[in-house]
Amino acid sequence: MGKLELTFIADIHSNLEALEVVLEKVKGGPIYCLGDLVGYGANPNEVIDIVRSKGIKCILGNHDYAVCTGDTSYFNPRAVNAILWTRRVVTKENSEFLLSLPRILRLKKENRKILLAHATPENPIFGDYIHPETDPFKFLSYATEYEEDIMGLGHLHVPYAYHKLDKVIFNPGSVGQPRDGNPLARYCTINLESLKVKFFELDYDRELSARKIVQAGLPTIFATRLFKGI
């Protein structure tokens, strides 16, 4: 990968098998994670350990925030179940790592200004689930009101790329729990010169990931949805 390309991942959600497959495919170059390392899945410590060991730059997601603070007020009961389980098993060191993550990350690469946030730039932790097709005016406002050339968002678990005014707003999709009807692990790259976004999808051992979720006593839906991409 050349210096003009950056790799983005998001919403790993403690899915070790999906993360390992993605990182095996991505060779070289900086990797950025748009939040939610944990939640739903059965390997929070292993995921955090890998992210830390590889120096992947991350921002804080809403599940990360809930795990390290205990604030579950914005979650449904099944998600709360997974958050409380994760709080019990995550190491103190890894919890402190999550708490240290920035809510927004601003970068400059090859004369391109970049803004990374989990949900939305104005409300990175508790913002809405947004998509260019359902929220066109919001995306137009981001393109006109923010100075950044590139804006990366997570949270939705659905990949997209919105191009406007020589800018791009994108979501790489979810590594560990896609929700667009396709269960494959997702990530994307961006060419800093052309702003072209390339999306990638990879299969992984979903049987193993699902079995771990069930064996951990987590809600079964978090296992079954891995096969449906919902």
What do these predicted ranges mean?
Residues 1-7, 107-115, 164-168, 194-196:
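Beta-strand-turn-beta hairpins that frame and shape the catalytic cleft
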Residues 2-99:
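Core catalytic region of metal-dependent phosphoesterases/phosphodiesterases
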Residues 12, 116-122, 151-159:
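Histidine-centered catalytic micro-motifs
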Residues 75-80, 114-146, 178:
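Active-site-proximal segments of metal-dependent phosphoesterases and phosphodiesterases across multiple
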Residues 104-106, 116, 161, 187-189:
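Conserved hydrophobic/aromatic beta-strand scaffold that supports enzyme active sites
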Residues 128-170:
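Anionic-ligand binding region
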Residues 162-230:
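Acidic, His/Gly-rich catalytic cores of divalent-metal-dependent hydrolytic chemistry
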